[in-house]
Amino acid sequence: MKVFSTSLWCGLLTLLSVMNLFKSVRGRPHLSSGHELFPAKEHAAQEKLTRNPGLQRPFHAGGDLPSKLEELRQVKKLRDWIMEAKNTGLSNALDNLSSSHTKKRACFWKYCV
């Protein structure tokens, strides 16, 4: 039991050390006292936006909007065309399958139904 307890503590210490190392490599130490547990609500949203620059809207997004809309329309047309082709192909296959089954008769030895 003592060996299990010792290995558990060593594993926990190693895990915390690695977590602290990764956080400090990213520029924010994990165990520092600079972070508040419950930050003020008016500052929380701004901090989240500054931490995640991918959430901020780029300035050049409006210039490509008409071309993106046209591309979206073309993709929708292509999707509809593919779905229509699949549906017609499937219905043709089902028609061929059902027509071939009506011509065949179920036979067992010399008795056919």
UniProtKB/Swiss-Prot annotation:
GO CC annotation terms, alphabetical: extracellular region
Disulfide bonds: C107-C112
Keywords: Cleavage on pair of basic residues, Disulfide bond, Hormone, Secreted, Signal
GO molecular function: hormone activity
InterPro entries: U-IIB, Urotensin_II
PROSITE patterns hit by this protein: UROTENSIN_II
Endpoints of the signal sequence: 1-27
Propeptide residue range(s): 28-103
Superkingdom in the source lineage: Eukaryota
One GO term of the biological process aspect: blood vessel diameter maintenance
Subcellular location: Secreted
PANTHER family, per the entry: UROTENSIN-2B
Protein role: Potent vasoconstrictor.
Protein family per UniProt: Belongs to the urotensin-2 family.
Protein name: Urotensin-2B
Species the sequence originates in: Mus musculus
Taxonomic lineage of the native organism: Eukaryota, Metazoa, Chordata, Craniata, Vertebrata
Name of the encoding gene: Uts2b
